[in-house]
Design a protein with these regions (language model features):
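Short beta-strand/loop segments at the ligand-binding rim of alpha/beta enzyme cores
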Residues: 1-5
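Alpha/beta catalytic cores of nucleotide-metabolism and tRNA/nucleoside-modifying enzymes
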Residues: 9-99
Length: 99
């Protein structure tokens, strides 16, 4: 089980986590902040909107389930590519080994 968590703030982050192989995605920081500031109803609204937006992302990318996002080609920025390469990892191997 691969859990995508930490720094997940919006639908784009959720989609990226699934595309990189996450089985589930944790979004606790924003939920706790919303509960503290606006109550449980705000959290429910946030997750309802996030779910709608994720469905739109999946529609645009031809995915019928979040796990299908693993099949979508991932394009890394120059900064990310350099970060990975400078740590001795093979980006091609990492990209082809996505679940």
């Amino acid at each position: 089980l691969f859990i995508g968590s930490g720094g997940i703030r919006n639908t784009g982050d959720v989609a990226k986590a699934f595309a990189l192989g996450a089985d589930v995605v944790g979004i606790t920081g924003i939920a706790l902040h919303l509960i503290q500031e606006s109550g449980v109803e705000a959290v429910v609204r946030y997750f309802e909107e996030l779910s709608k937006q994720l469905t739109n992302y999946m529609l645009l990318l031809g995915a019928t389930a979040p796990s299908d996002l693993r099949k979508v080609p991932v394009i890394y920025s120059c900064e990310t590519t350099n970060y990975i390469a400078n740590r001795g990892y093979d980006l091609v191997a990492l990209s082809s080994n996505r679940r």
